[in-house]
Amino acid sequence: MESRLFQVDAFAGRPFTGSPERIGPDGSLRKFFMLDPAITYLNHAAYGATPRPVFESFQRWQLDLERQPVDFLSRYSTERLAHARAVLADYVDTDRDNLVYVSNGTTGLNIIARSIPVGPNEEVLSSDHEHGGIDRLFRFASQKLGFTYVRREIPVPVTTHADFIDRFWGGVTERTKVILLSHFTSPTSLLFPVEEICRRARAAGILTIIDGSHVPGQFPLSLRRLDPDFYVGILHKWVCAPKGCAFLYARPSAQGLLDPLIVSWGWAPKNPGPSKFVDFHEWQGSRDVSEFLAAPDAIAFQAEYDWDTVRSQCRELALYAQREVTRITGIPPYHSTPEWAGQVVCANLPRHIGNPDDFKNRLRFEHNIEVSVDVFRDQPRIRISIQGYNTIGDVHALLAALQRLL
Protein backbone atom coordinates (compact mmCIF):
# COMPACT_ATOMS: atom_id res chain seq x y z
CA MET A 1 0.00 0.00 0.00
CA GLU A 2 2.84 2.40 0.80
CA SER A 3 4.25 2.18 -2.70
CA ARG A 4 0.86 3.13 -4.14
CA LEU A 5 0.37 6.00 -1.74
CA PHE A 6 3.88 7.37 -2.00
CA GLN A 7 5.91 7.72 -5.15
CA VAL A 8 8.50 10.39 -5.85
CA ASP A 9 5.84 12.36 -7.71
CA ALA A 10 3.07 11.47 -5.26
CA PHE A 11 2.34 15.08 -4.47
CA ALA A 12 1.71 16.30 -7.98
CA GLY A 13 -1.92 17.06 -7.17
CA ARG A 14 -3.42 13.84 -8.51
CA PRO A 15 -6.26 12.20 -6.56
CA PHE A 16 -5.84 8.93 -4.71
CA THR A 17 -6.93 6.02 -6.91
CA GLY A 18 -6.78 3.09 -4.48
CA SER A 19 -9.57 1.77 -2.26
CA PRO A 20 -9.75 4.26 0.61
CA GLU A 21 -12.67 2.51 2.30
CA ARG A 22 -10.25 -0.30 3.25
CA ILE A 23 -7.59 2.01 4.70
CA GLY A 24 -7.01 2.34 8.44
CA PRO A 25 -8.57 0.86 11.58
CA ASP A 26 -12.12 -0.46 11.33
CA GLY A 27 -13.50 1.43 14.34
CA SER A 28 -13.77 -1.58 16.64
CA LEU A 29 -11.38 -0.02 19.17
CA ARG A 30 -13.40 3.17 19.61
CA LYS A 31 -15.49 1.62 22.36
CA PHE A 32 -12.45 1.52 24.64
CA PHE A 33 -11.76 5.26 24.51
CA MET A 34 -13.63 7.94 26.43
CA LEU A 35 -13.22 10.74 23.91
CA ASP A 36 -16.26 12.90 23.16
CA PRO A 37 -18.03 11.13 20.26
CA ALA A 38 -19.23 14.48 18.94
CA ILE A 39 -15.64 15.50 18.17
CA THR A 40 -13.55 14.18 15.29
CA TYR A 41 -10.35 13.76 17.27
CA LEU A 42 -7.21 13.90 15.12
CA ASN A 43 -4.79 15.28 17.71
CA HIS A 44 -3.67 12.25 19.70
CA ALA A 45 -0.07 13.49 19.49
CA ALA A 46 -0.90 16.41 21.78
CA TYR A 47 -1.76 14.60 25.02
CA GLY A 48 -2.72 11.06 24.09
CA ALA A 49 -5.90 9.26 25.11
CA THR A 50 -6.26 6.39 27.55
CA PRO A 51 -8.46 3.33 26.96
CA ARG A 52 -11.01 2.64 29.66
CA PRO A 53 -9.43 -0.60 30.99
CA VAL A 54 -6.13 1.22 31.56
CA PHE A 55 -7.89 4.22 33.09
CA GLU A 56 -9.76 1.92 35.47
CA SER A 57 -6.47 0.33 36.54
CA PHE A 58 -5.13 3.83 37.19
CA GLN A 59 -8.17 4.64 39.34
CA ARG A 60 -7.79 1.40 41.32
CA TRP A 61 -4.26 2.43 42.21
CA GLN A 62 -5.53 5.84 43.29
CA LEU A 63 -8.17 4.24 45.50
CA ASP A 64 -5.49 2.02 47.00
CA LEU A 65 -3.50 5.14 47.82
CA GLU A 66 -6.47 6.78 49.54
CA ARG A 67 -7.31 3.69 51.58
CA GLN A 68 -3.86 3.51 53.18
CA PRO A 69 -1.47 6.29 52.10
CA VAL A 70 1.40 5.14 54.33
CA ASP A 71 1.27 1.58 53.06
CA PHE A 72 1.02 2.78 49.48
CA LEU A 73 3.82 5.37 49.54
CA SER A 74 6.15 4.32 52.35
CA ARG A 75 5.91 0.53 52.36
CA TYR A 76 5.06 -0.66 48.88
CA SER A 77 5.79 2.03 46.30
CA THR A 78 9.47 1.15 45.84
CA GLU A 79 8.72 -2.49 45.06
CA ARG A 80 5.75 -1.64 42.85
CA LEU A 81 7.68 0.98 40.91
CA ALA A 82 10.54 -1.48 40.42
CA HIS A 83 8.06 -3.90 38.84
CA ALA A 84 6.64 -1.15 36.63
CA ARG A 85 10.15 -0.22 35.53
CA ALA A 86 10.95 -3.85 34.77
CA VAL A 87 7.91 -4.13 32.48
CA LEU A 88 8.84 -0.87 30.77
CA ALA A 89 12.49 -1.95 30.45
CA ASP A 90 11.42 -5.08 28.61
CA TYR A 91 9.23 -2.96 26.32
CA VAL A 92 12.03 -0.53 25.36
CA ASP A 93 14.86 -3.10 25.54
CA THR A 94 17.09 -2.01 28.37
CA ASP A 95 17.78 -2.91 32.00
CA ARG A 96 15.33 -1.94 34.73
CA ASP A 97 17.66 0.34 36.65
CA ASN A 98 18.54 2.41 33.59
CA LEU A 99 15.03 3.92 33.77
CA VAL A 100 13.03 6.15 36.06
CA TYR A 101 9.47 7.32 35.62
CA VAL A 102 8.89 11.07 35.28
CA SER A 103 5.70 13.05 34.76
CA ASN A 104 6.39 14.24 31.22
CA GLY A 105 9.11 14.69 28.64
CA THR A 106 9.78 18.24 29.77
CA THR A 107 10.65 17.05 33.28
CA GLY A 108 13.03 14.40 31.99
CA LEU A 109 14.82 16.82 29.70
CA ASN A 110 15.04 19.43 32.46
CA ILE A 111 16.88 16.91 34.62
CA ILE A 112 19.39 16.43 31.81
CA ALA A 113 19.71 20.07 30.73
CA ARG A 114 20.45 21.26 34.27
CA SER A 115 23.13 18.62 34.81
CA ILE A 116 25.09 18.23 31.58
CA PRO A 117 28.81 19.08 31.86
CA VAL A 118 28.99 21.84 29.27
CA GLY A 119 29.93 25.48 29.69
CA PRO A 120 31.57 28.53 28.10
CA ASN A 121 33.28 28.02 24.73
CA GLU A 122 31.44 24.72 24.28
CA GLU A 123 28.42 23.87 22.14
CA VAL A 124 25.20 21.89 22.27
CA LEU A 125 24.25 20.97 18.71
CA SER A 126 20.57 20.54 17.90
CA SER A 127 18.23 21.05 14.94
CA ASP A 128 15.60 23.62 14.02
CA HIS A 129 12.90 20.91 14.21
CA GLU A 130 12.83 20.60 18.00
CA HIS A 131 9.80 20.92 20.26
CA GLY A 132 9.21 24.54 21.26
CA GLY A 133 9.30 23.82 24.99
CA ILE A 134 12.58 21.93 24.73
CA ASP A 135 14.07 24.58 22.47
CA ARG A 136 13.23 27.14 25.16
CA LEU A 137 14.72 24.90 27.84
CA PHE A 138 18.09 24.72 26.12
CA ARG A 139 18.10 28.43 25.32
CA PHE A 140 17.50 29.01 29.03
CA ALA A 141 20.21 26.52 30.03
CA SER A 142 22.68 28.12 27.62
CA GLN A 143 22.18 31.47 29.35
CA LYS A 144 22.69 29.91 32.78
CA LEU A 145 25.62 27.65 31.94
CA GLY A 146 27.31 29.75 29.27
CA PHE A 147 27.40 27.24 26.42
CA THR A 148 26.38 28.02 22.85
CA TYR A 149 23.15 26.43 21.67
CA VAL A 150 23.43 25.69 17.93
CA ARG A 151 20.24 24.96 15.96
CA ARG A 152 21.34 23.23 12.77
CA GLU A 153 18.98 23.93 9.87
CA ILE A 154 17.53 20.79 8.30
CA PRO A 155 16.01 21.74 4.92
CA VAL A 156 12.58 20.44 3.94
CA PRO A 157 11.49 18.45 2.16
CA VAL A 158 13.99 15.98 3.56
CA THR A 159 15.45 13.54 1.05
CA THR A 160 17.47 10.52 2.23
CA HIS A 161 18.67 9.41 5.64
CA ALA A 162 22.26 9.62 4.42
CA ASP A 163 21.76 13.22 3.34
CA PHE A 164 20.21 14.08 6.71
CA ILE A 165 23.08 12.49 8.63
CA ASP A 166 25.72 14.28 6.58
CA ARG A 167 23.84 17.57 6.84
CA PHE A 168 23.42 17.36 10.60
CA TRP A 169 26.91 16.05 11.28
CA GLY A 170 28.30 18.95 9.29
CA GLY A 171 27.36 21.11 12.27
CA VAL A 172 29.76 19.29 14.60
CA THR A 173 32.85 21.28 15.58
CA GLU A 174 35.69 20.79 18.04
CA ARG A 175 33.51 22.70 20.53
CA THR A 176 30.56 20.31 20.26
CA LYS A 177 30.18 18.49 23.58
CA VAL A 178 26.51 17.49 23.46
CA ILE A 179 23.99 16.61 20.73
CA LEU A 180 20.28 17.15 21.39
CA LEU A 181 18.01 15.66 18.74
CA SER A 182 14.41 14.56 18.40
CA HIS A 183 13.81 10.96 17.41
CA PHE A 184 10.43 11.93 15.95
CA THR A 185 9.92 15.65 15.55
CA SER A 186 6.98 17.46 17.09
CA PRO A 187 6.60 20.42 14.67
CA THR A 188 7.27 18.49 11.44
CA SER A 189 6.45 14.82 12.20
CA LEU A 190 9.67 13.35 10.81
CA LEU A 191 11.40 10.20 12.07
CA PHE A 192 15.05 11.19 12.27
CA PRO A 193 17.75 8.48 11.80
CA VAL A 194 19.25 9.05 15.24
CA GLU A 195 20.95 5.65 15.60
CA GLU A 196 23.78 6.63 13.26
CA ILE A 197 24.07 10.03 14.94
CA CYS A 198 24.46 8.29 18.32
CA ARG A 199 27.09 5.95 16.90
CA ARG A 200 29.15 8.79 15.44
CA ALA A 201 28.79 10.85 18.59
CA ARG A 202 30.02 8.04 20.83
CA ALA A 203 33.08 7.58 18.62
CA ALA A 204 33.75 11.32 18.86
CA GLY A 205 33.24 11.52 22.64
CA ILE A 206 30.08 13.64 22.33
CA LEU A 207 27.16 13.09 24.71
CA THR A 208 23.79 12.37 23.08
CA ILE A 209 20.38 13.46 24.34
CA ILE A 210 17.49 12.02 22.35
CA ASP A 211 14.01 13.48 22.76
CA GLY A 212 11.87 10.46 22.01
CA SER A 213 8.62 11.92 23.26
CA HIS A 214 6.55 10.61 20.33
CA VAL A 215 8.32 7.28 19.80
CA PRO A 216 7.20 4.71 22.42
CA GLY A 217 4.04 3.09 21.17
CA GLN A 218 4.33 4.62 17.71
CA PHE A 219 7.55 2.88 16.65
CA PRO A 220 9.51 -0.11 17.97
CA LEU A 221 12.22 1.10 20.35
CA SER A 222 15.41 -0.68 21.38
CA LEU A 223 17.50 1.49 23.67
CA ARG A 224 20.13 -1.23 23.68
CA ARG A 225 20.58 -0.90 19.92
CA LEU A 226 20.15 2.87 19.78
CA ASP A 227 22.63 3.36 22.65
CA PRO A 228 22.20 7.07 23.45
CA ASP A 229 23.56 8.58 26.63
CA PHE A 230 20.13 9.94 27.56
CA TYR A 231 16.67 9.27 26.17
CA VAL A 232 13.30 10.63 27.22
CA GLY A 233 10.06 9.00 26.10
CA ILE A 234 6.42 9.77 26.86
CA LEU A 235 4.01 6.96 27.66
CA HIS A 236 0.74 8.87 27.89
CA LYS A 237 0.93 9.64 24.17
CA TRP A 238 1.24 6.58 21.92
CA VAL A 239 1.40 3.90 24.63
CA CYS A 240 -1.91 5.34 25.91
CA ALA A 241 -0.90 5.31 29.59
CA PRO A 242 -2.64 7.73 31.98
CA LYS A 243 -1.68 11.40 31.72
CA GLY A 244 1.56 12.35 33.42
CA CYS A 245 3.52 9.22 32.53
CA ALA A 246 6.94 9.34 30.87
CA PHE A 247 10.42 7.96 31.44
CA LEU A 248 14.03 9.06 31.60
CA TYR A 249 16.71 6.66 30.43
CA ALA A 250 20.39 7.12 31.20
CA ARG A 251 23.19 4.89 29.97
CA PRO A 252 25.02 3.40 32.99
CA SER A 253 28.20 5.33 32.15
CA ALA A 254 26.23 8.60 32.09
CA GLN A 255 23.95 8.14 35.10
CA GLY A 256 26.41 9.77 37.49
CA LEU A 257 26.22 13.01 35.50
CA LEU A 258 22.60 13.65 36.46
CA ASP A 259 21.68 15.52 39.61
CA PRO A 260 18.13 15.15 40.93
CA LEU A 261 15.87 17.96 39.81
CA ILE A 262 14.11 17.70 43.18
CA VAL A 263 16.33 16.73 46.11
CA SER A 264 14.59 14.55 48.69
CA TRP A 265 15.07 11.30 50.61
CA GLY A 266 16.72 9.64 47.64
CA TRP A 267 19.81 11.79 48.19
CA ALA A 268 21.93 9.84 50.72
CA PRO A 269 18.97 7.53 51.50
CA LYS A 270 18.61 5.66 54.78
CA ASN A 271 18.10 2.42 52.87
CA PRO A 272 19.93 2.68 49.55
CA GLY A 273 18.59 0.66 46.66
CA PRO A 274 20.67 -1.12 44.03
CA SER A 275 20.78 1.99 41.84
CA LYS A 276 21.85 5.45 42.96
CA PHE A 277 20.34 6.79 39.72
CA VAL A 278 16.92 5.44 40.72
CA ASP A 279 17.31 6.63 44.33
CA PHE A 280 18.14 10.16 43.17
CA HIS A 281 15.28 10.58 40.73
CA GLU A 282 12.41 8.33 41.83
CA TRP A 283 11.49 9.79 45.20
CA GLN A 284 10.43 13.42 44.76
CA GLY A 285 8.39 13.92 47.92
CA SER A 286 4.72 13.11 48.39
CA ARG A 287 3.05 12.51 45.04
CA ASP A 288 0.61 10.16 43.38
CA VAL A 289 2.51 7.58 41.32
CA SER A 290 -0.60 5.72 40.15
CA GLU A 291 -0.04 6.64 36.50
CA PHE A 292 3.38 4.95 36.62
CA LEU A 293 1.95 1.81 38.20
CA ALA A 294 -0.71 1.65 35.48
CA ALA A 295 1.83 1.88 32.65
CA PRO A 296 2.29 -1.93 32.48
CA ASP A 297 -1.46 -2.23 31.92
CA ALA A 298 -1.22 0.16 28.96
CA ILE A 299 1.56 -1.96 27.48
CA ALA A 300 -0.50 -5.12 28.08
CA PHE A 301 -3.61 -3.57 26.52
CA GLN A 302 -1.79 -2.85 23.29
CA ALA A 303 -0.29 -6.34 23.24
CA GLU A 304 -3.74 -7.89 23.73
CA TYR A 305 -5.20 -5.98 20.79
CA ASP A 306 -2.34 -6.62 18.35
CA TRP A 307 -1.07 -3.05 18.29
CA ASP A 308 1.59 -3.83 15.72
CA THR A 309 -1.24 -4.31 13.24
CA VAL A 310 -3.09 -1.27 14.59
CA ARG A 311 0.01 0.88 14.14
CA SER A 312 0.41 -0.29 10.56
CA GLN A 313 -3.23 0.50 9.80
CA CYS A 314 -2.93 3.92 11.41
CA ARG A 315 0.23 4.76 9.51
CA GLU A 316 -1.41 3.79 6.23
CA LEU A 317 -4.38 6.05 6.99
CA ALA A 318 -2.08 8.89 8.06
CA LEU A 319 -0.20 8.72 4.76
CA TYR A 320 -3.50 8.73 2.88
CA ALA A 321 -4.64 11.79 4.85
CA GLN A 322 -1.39 13.60 4.10
CA ARG A 323 -1.66 12.84 0.41
CA GLU A 324 -5.25 14.04 0.19
CA VAL A 325 -4.60 17.29 2.08
CA THR A 326 -1.65 17.89 -0.22
CA ARG A 327 -3.91 17.29 -3.22
CA ILE A 328 -6.27 19.99 -1.90
CA THR A 329 -3.55 22.55 -1.19
CA GLY A 330 -1.09 21.74 -3.98
CA ILE A 331 1.80 22.37 -1.55
CA PRO A 332 4.41 19.58 -1.10
CA PRO A 333 4.86 18.22 2.44
CA TYR A 334 8.08 17.80 4.41
CA HIS A 335 8.95 14.41 2.85
CA SER A 336 8.10 12.43 -0.27
CA THR A 337 8.96 8.91 0.88
CA PRO A 338 7.31 6.99 3.74
CA GLU A 339 10.32 6.04 5.86
CA TRP A 340 10.11 9.43 7.57
CA ALA A 341 6.46 9.01 8.60
CA GLY A 342 4.51 7.39 11.41
CA GLN A 343 1.02 7.75 12.80
CA VAL A 344 1.46 11.53 12.74
CA VAL A 345 1.91 13.45 9.51
CA CYS A 346 2.14 17.10 8.57
CA ALA A 347 0.89 18.89 5.46
CA ASN A 348 1.43 22.51 4.55
CA LEU A 349 -1.49 24.93 4.37
CA PRO A 350 -1.71 28.09 2.26
CA ARG A 351 -0.67 31.32 3.95
CA HIS A 352 -4.04 32.91 3.30
CA ILE A 353 -5.58 30.96 6.20
CA GLY A 354 -4.38 33.80 8.42
CA ASN A 355 -3.75 33.18 12.11
CA PRO A 356 -3.19 29.43 12.65
CA ASP A 357 -4.87 29.48 16.07
CA ASP A 358 -7.96 31.09 14.56
CA PHE A 359 -8.02 28.50 11.77
CA LYS A 360 -7.61 25.67 14.28
CA ASN A 361 -10.48 27.05 16.34
CA ARG A 362 -12.68 27.30 13.24
CA LEU A 363 -12.10 23.61 12.63
CA ARG A 364 -12.89 22.90 16.28
CA PHE A 365 -15.98 25.06 16.80
CA GLU A 366 -17.47 25.18 13.29
CA HIS A 367 -16.70 21.61 12.24
CA ASN A 368 -16.13 19.74 15.54
CA ILE A 369 -12.64 18.66 14.46
CA GLU A 370 -9.71 18.70 16.87
CA VAL A 371 -6.43 18.83 14.96
CA SER A 372 -3.13 20.68 15.34
CA VAL A 373 -2.56 23.77 13.19
CA ASP A 374 0.66 25.71 13.66
CA VAL A 375 3.51 27.36 11.75
CA PHE A 376 6.92 26.04 10.75
CA ARG A 377 9.32 28.54 9.17
CA ASP A 378 6.52 31.03 8.53
CA GLN A 379 4.48 28.41 6.63
CA PRO A 380 1.19 27.23 8.19
CA ARG A 381 0.90 23.50 8.57
CA ILE A 382 -1.64 20.98 9.81
CA ARG A 383 -0.54 17.97 11.87
CA ILE A 384 -2.83 14.94 11.67
CA SER A 385 -2.62 12.16 14.26
CA ILE A 386 -4.16 8.74 13.67
CA GLN A 387 -4.68 6.35 16.58
CA GLY A 388 -6.55 3.06 16.81
CA TYR A 389 -9.86 4.77 17.54
CA ASN A 390 -9.76 6.74 14.27
CA THR A 391 -11.27 5.62 10.97
CA ILE A 392 -11.20 6.87 7.42
CA GLY A 393 -14.47 8.67 8.17
CA ASP A 394 -12.56 10.99 10.50
CA VAL A 395 -10.11 11.81 7.72
CA HIS A 396 -12.92 12.43 5.25
CA ALA A 397 -14.58 14.81 7.73
CA LEU A 398 -11.33 16.78 7.90
CA LEU A 399 -10.91 16.81 4.13
CA ALA A 400 -14.45 18.08 3.65
CA ALA A 401 -13.90 20.84 6.20
CA LEU A 402 -10.63 21.90 4.59
CA GLN A 403 -12.23 22.07 1.17
CA ARG A 404 -14.88 24.40 2.56
CA LEU A 405 -12.45 26.57 4.52
CA LEU A 406 -9.72 26.78 1.89
Where are these regions (language model features)?
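Active-site PLP attachment segment
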Residues: 226-271
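Conserved PLP-anchoring active-site segment centered on the Schiff-base-forming lysine
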Residues: 97-98, 115-136, 148
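Conserved PLP-binding catalytic core of the aspartate aminotransferase-like
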Residues: 4-15, 315-319, 328-366
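Conserved N-terminal alpha-helix of the aminotransferase class I/II PLP-enzyme fold
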Residues: 68-107, 314
